[in-house]
Amino acid sequence: MAFKFKGSLSAVDATLKGGVKFDNEKLPDSKNMPEGKFTINEIDNSSTTDLASNTLVTNFGKQDNVAGMLSFNTGDWENNNSAPVKLMMRVVNNSNDSDWVTIFDSTKTTVTWSSIASAGQTVFTVPNLDFKKAIIYINGILQYPGISYQTFGGTVTFSNSLQAGDNVYIVVGEDSDNTTNTQYISTALDNQTTIILPYEKNSNYLFINGVLQYPNSFTIVNNTITLNSSMQQDDNIFVLSNDKIVPNYTAVAIQDQTDFTITGTIIDPVVYINGVLQYDTHYTISGNTLSFVSKLFAGDEVLVFLDSLNLIDNINTEYNSVIDDVNNSNKINIPYFHFSELQVFINGILQNPDNGAYDLNGTEVTLSSPLQEGDDIHVIVYNSPIQDDNIVTKADLSSYASITELNLLKDSLKAEGINLKWQPHLPSIEVAFGLPRRSLKIWKAGNTSTINQYWLYPVDGTVWSGIGTLGNVPSTPFYKLDSNKDVITWTYTATSDNINRIFVPYNFGSINIFINGVLQNIELGHYTYNGQYIDLNGSLNIGDNLVAILGKLILNTNPYLTYETANGQFVSKSDLSSNTGSLMVGTSDGNNLQQTLNNKVNSVLLSSNNGSSIVGTSSGLSVQAEIDNIKKQFTDSKVLISKLIPNSTQDQTALMQSEVNSLTSGMTYITPTGTILITTVVIPTLKGMTFKFDGTIFKLPDGATPLDSDMIRFNSLSYSTVSGLYTDGNRSNIIDTSGTNPWYGRVINWRLGNNSTFVYFQNTTMVNSLYCGSQWGNNISNIVLDGIYADNIGEHLFYISGNGGGNNKNILFKNMMIDSIGVNPNNSIASHACAVVKSSQTIGLNDYFCIDGLTFKQTQTPGYAVIVVVNGDCVHFDIKNFQVGKNVGGIISPLGTCEYMKVSNGYSLDTTSGVPLVYTYPNSSNIVQTYWVAENIIMPNAYSQINSQLFDVYRDCHFGRIDVSNDQSNTVFKDGKTLKYINCKFTLPTTGLQLTYVLRDISFDNCQFDSTITGNSAVVDYIGQNEYTSNTRVSFNNCKFNSTTNYTIGTFNNLVNLSMTNCYGIIKKIYARNSTSINKLKIANTEFDGTTTPVTATSITMKMLSNVINTSTGRDYSFYRNQWSIPAGQTSIGYDLSSTFIGSISAFSVQVTPQGTYSGPTKYWTVVSGTTVTIYVDVAPTTNMTFNIQVSG
């Protein structure tokens, strides 16, 4: 028997000794073959190879025309035992050509310097490597930090185990305060098309579910991204942004295309196909020609960035690895480097540390998910100072094969037409379904299908045909194909985790297995099978898909089969599922199933009152018995279905109180859909409860006189769920009982009582409350409220906890939508500010409150100010992912201890007016503060951010202006507190930033000042006017000024310590107001714009100047050099250098040297007064006397 190879045998071990194995497979016209696997030498030692004709000739000692599988290692031309790739050839019948199956044998070699990762591996440790940040891809798909992986030190930890063939690619680098890179992470709502970024950058790279979106798939204006098509619920959004503009090249491939001509200058290219990152082993670039190793499909979209995107700071290196054995781990360690930031890719997919894809710990990368055999890991390391005694060269980055060897292997395999990517082997599936050669393609939405084209849907392994445009899932006009009668495709989807043994409901003689579209190799130990059981070397997790192609050889070798069955005349699954299926199944009485059913049970009997007693179930009981059991369980145990009458005009307080009094711990209480009128219902102390209020509206009756009352009061609730609580306070129909105040009364919609813990509230609504929406007691912990809507609330929405309250911890408010609170007119009379959440205590500090996701519109004009948080004695408070309307007075009103406050990812819904972070800072506030930080706050309007000194750091914020005020006497700050603005932008109004109190160091780093200043004000003005603490400094580092006024910085106090370093733009001058002096002035590498006097001050006590340039004079204000001449007959020459030097000139900085010979004078000297320098001689010269003069700043 002869097999002709489609390529050259010179690329493989031509002797085939011990390397070729036969795995029998049965095809329709094949002869019978015994089961088993044989090497060629075992079957026929006379096998030969003819290199000239590329033919393997062997007899096998069996009948001709036998279908089978040949597999052997390719070798690396230097050592045949270290073959990196195993080729498997399917030998079929005359109607189908032979073809290759390509399998990585990663135990032999790897294309990167990293050690080979294990199947199930999540932890990777690399010696001598540290990093702080990483960008990670798995199979070219960007991973989400904090969810997909975590990083710590040198370790990446993935959340979930990776699969065989997954490729990990990591880029690492440092965490720098000076970075221009910004990340935005969010989760999509269903049909969402708009993404609003809390910043503005020149370049924004949008990944959805880790896949890069192409430039023509969305538009971006300012900070708003608009998608051409909508996202689905919970789609992961990840935007990487910076100010680097990188040109790109795009193309759409035609079938089997490999080469593309790139227009533009190629510097450090980054290549994507269909949004998936391609590693440099997948392509080569020669000149402007991009060549892919593998042929592309028609419609594949190619995107090439011509230079590095610099999406992470201080890139050091990259790490790449392929998962190839069976150890159970999920960490990655990056070898040989010290670094502070990295990017991790798994199978080309960028991993995201903030979404939990991995953790870093020293040099150890811990993946959140174990990897599988064949997974490829790639890491780029940034900011990695190499140790002198541990220099890493490029050669060190290859562990087994040299770069030359790997390139030789890649080129040779490419010539053989071998695809080195893990993917379903389409020729194998074509054989199983009897399809023409090269007629099968991978299903991709948007492709056009014509006649005689077939498509493999990779989600479930089914094959489809038809004419039309492919959708997201197969449907009409496409139809699913059945495989050959001799070859059955069976699909299994894991319904739970850790499945490693699977029962196949068929008797089969051979099997090929694909897991999530990846071919598994029994020779590499991926699986074994015994009878109808498959035993996997790893474990499937929920949702994993297994497709088995089963060879039904046993049907043809069973001597007891009838002639009809052997020739395919048997009942198929589709036959049984038809309307006549019951006629094809026989029974023991000689009838078919339909006849037996007709004889045993007639339709009249089944339709009678006791018909349910006749029909049985799998438990052995009748349907009626099963129904009776379910009803009994409801009645006897844990469910109470309320008998409240919905939409009745009667007050049903008494009935509901009676029902809740009968509840015991562990029960479920279900109320009907509709409106229920109640006044006050007290739910007793309970545990393990489920309250299903979905669809019920609890409303206060008209004409009620509530005074101090609660509509729903949970006395004390633990380990319970409350779903759909909707309360309506009916504030427009209550009765005034005070006689003076039409809004008197402290009725609240619902109350959570003392000692409640571990309660989950889902979809909570509060409207029309007279007082607060909800008030809580004390010692409450671990409460989650997810999905909150509120409107027309009299005062606070959540009051936690009022008089007698406190010691409440771990409270999370998620996904809040607030239309209006604080609407009571009495709030104005009492100057009473109201909040979405008010923290208060009298018995102990509250701790760990968090608001995550808030839209606060305030559609009504409030009685007084409304704010997000009134914080009285909550130690930790976190407010993130919020947007507020123009009627909101502020974000925070500090009234007590708050050691840690973080406000992040927030912006104003109105672009014409702003919202201050700090609403008020009263002297009565007993604030104990340790660390406050604001990040990604976008308020680019005219509103001033007052009391800014309460925060320690502002990072990536956009404000109109800022003011600092005096510290109140009761405030206790941490030692060494400073005020920093990092990467901030200020669009100033008609008056500048006012730093009237300089009580600690204030620094502006990488900030931009866009001024609209006119008149006699500065961009940053009145520095230290009211108070300036000695030895404090105001500094501007790497800042850009766009000032059009007559001066840029105005100081006011004689003790000012001012520093400007690496500043640029339109800087007019520094002006000491009110005829004051400057104590200390440092200016370095700074350019002033068009002014003859960069600094105006009565005096400068100490100055340090270097590289201070004035564009109007072109002079360096740290150095002056010239030639002065005393005319014949005169004894002095002098000049005022005030237009050249800033402040007074020291006599020690002046150097004077006579030039050439002269007659008359015997000595000379200099006199310095302020900025005037004069040279004197004792005797007038007879001719002009020239001096070289040099003055340093």
Swiss-Prot record:
This is Depolymerase, capsule KN5-specific. GO terms for biological process: adhesion receptor-mediated virion attachment to host cell; symbiont entry into host cell via disruption of host cell envelope; symbiont entry into host cell via disruption of host cell glycocalyx. The gene is S2-1. GO terms for cellular component: virus tail. Keywords: Degradation of host capsule during virus entry, Degradation of host cell envelope components during virus entry, Host-virus interaction, Viral attachment to host adhesion receptor, Viral attachment to host cell, Viral tail protein, Virion, Virus entry into host cell. It is found in: Virion. It comes from the Viruses. Functions as a receptor binding protein (RBP) and probably mediates the attachment to the host capsular exopolysaccharides. Displays a depolymerase activity that specifically degrades the KN5-type polysaccharides of Klebsiella pneumoniae capsule. InterPro entries: Pectin_lyas_fold, Pectin_lyase_fold/virulence.
